[in-house]
């Protein structure tokens, strides 16, 4: 879990950071529809399943932007060298979910090895956090594959210094000749503005339009 201390003093967003961290601590969410038409077609001849592929692509996009890898450590702002996805797994028998994490790798084959290893070990464990303590360097990914939504928001009480992005996918649906996936991104306003979330979403769309390798 390597990281770099961030130079807040000379940051162009210093005023924004301090205002939304101390004077008006808040977050916001933004929902957009990701076109997954090309991605789904490419998976027809692949051994990879859609959900872990989306976890991989989301993690890949998040890891390209400093503002999505920021955290407070020892009361200082830092940027993790990389963040690992923490994702939800639904248990049909109990109608509950667990949150699992696996090491991120930019190589999709290695990432899938990591993902499958975690799933094989913990997929039947119904505790909320089967692996115990969540890694400090993480992002959050979950899915609601039962419903298509236009917006999604987590109402967080007593908003504090939790800067990890929270990304939620809905049920995808056909619209004309396109397959669209609603995706909600929730962030802390101290480290992210609408511009940064839009940049992440646009990058994720580019990744979904590209070949996996």
UniProtKB/Swiss-Prot annotation:
Active site: 189 (proton acceptor)
Gene Ontology MF, one: chloramphenicol O-acetyltransferase activity
Short name of one Pfam family: CAT
Keywords: Acyltransferase, Antibiotic resistance, Plasmid, Transferase
First-tier enzyme category under EC: transferase
Keyword presence, Acyltransferase: yes
Catalytic activity: chloramphenicol + acetyl-CoA = chloramphenicol 3-acetate + CoA
GO biological process: response to antibiotic
EC code(s) of this entry: 2.3.1.28
Family: Belongs to the chloramphenicol acetyltransferase family.
PANTHER family according to UniProt: CHLORAMPHENICOL ACETYLTRANSFERASE, SLR0299 PROTEIN
Subunit-level organization: Homotrimer.
Its job: This enzyme is an effector of chloramphenicol resistance in bacteria.
NCBIfam families attached to this UniProt entry: chloram_CatA
Protein name (Swiss-Prot/TrEMBL): Chloramphenicol acetyltransferase 3
Native source organism of the sequence: Escherichia coli
Organism phylogeny: Bacteria, Pseudomonadati, Pseudomonadota, Gammaproteobacteria, Enterobacterales
Gene it is expressed from: cat3
């Amino acid at each position: 879990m390597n990281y770099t201390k961030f130079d807040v003093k000379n940051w162009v967003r210093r005023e924004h950071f301090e205002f939304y961290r101390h004077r008006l601590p808040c977050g916001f969410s933004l929902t957009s529809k990701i076109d997954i038409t090309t991605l789904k077609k490419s998976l027809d001849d692949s051994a990879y399943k859609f959900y872990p592929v989306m976890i991989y692509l989301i993690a890949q996009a998040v890891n390209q932007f400093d503002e999505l890898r920021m955290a407070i450590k020892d009361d200082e702002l830092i940027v993790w060298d990389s963040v690992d996805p923490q994702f939800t797994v639904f248990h049909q028998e109990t109608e509950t979910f667990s949150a699992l994490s696996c090491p991120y790798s930019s190589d999709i084959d290695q990432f899938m090895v990591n993902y499958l290893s975690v799933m094989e070990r913990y997929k039947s464990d119904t505790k909320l956090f089967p692996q115990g303590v969540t890694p400090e360097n993480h992002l959050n990914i979950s899915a609601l594959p039962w419903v298509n939504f236009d917006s999604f928001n987590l109402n967080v009480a007593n908003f504090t210094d939790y800067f990890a992005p929270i990304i939620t996918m809905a049920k995808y649906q056909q619209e004309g000749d396109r397959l669209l996936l609603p995706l909600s991104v929730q962030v802390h306003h101290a480290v992210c503005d609408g511009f940064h979330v839009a940049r992440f979403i646009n990058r994720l769309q580019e990744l979904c339009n590209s070949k996996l390798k």
